[in-house]
């Protein structure tokens, strides 16, 4: 051990690719927190990722019982225990890496007792993560993914910002395919503070995400649309077209098997024979059915997540 510590600086002579490969093995091991801890103990971490050592002794107070460095190791370990992939583990390890550089003491906080603030640490941390991963020669795709997760990890910490429209925006930023990965990083952050995995708030976030991601219940789901009605069936644009589409929607909501071109083309011909008054009645009934279906789907999601 003493020899390793004494000659730790020699790791600078090892290629970045080799160091990355060995570091990745540690991160993907069952006990990555122990592995990273050993790198620090042997004096190697400061030559590989010195940015992590900036968190040693960097107190956070408030909800946190660990310093930044310890918190990151606990978050990483949770990702490993869950069997989550490399990107999640690296994002867990780096998610608060920008805190030491953004820490400020604000004496006006906590009722005048004062507290540390870390405003913008997610922005600084995302930039740091990219530099670290570029230095270690990680693939660009991996680096970009980790940086995106680090940059957005605070979204689910701000309870005041959690609205359906806000969830839609964050989904747009990270991508539908990555939103659940971001939630995994959020869970790592929470468990890294010695808190339970799935409190009510986290379950509520899951329900809101599913609500945002589910397919909309609208005429856009029909096998025919306004373009088909005009271009192929010769219908003129106007209120009647809208009423017909909503009338078709009501039937499809009752029986999804009817959502085929063959069936709907026939129904369009039949509906065209109706008066404006009858079509309007069909359209209003369809809107009511649509709203009821949406309400039931939202209730189902809330029941599923216990919120």
Label for each model-derived stretch:
Residues 207-245, 294-307:
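C-terminal accessory/binding modules appended to enzymatic or scaffolding proteins
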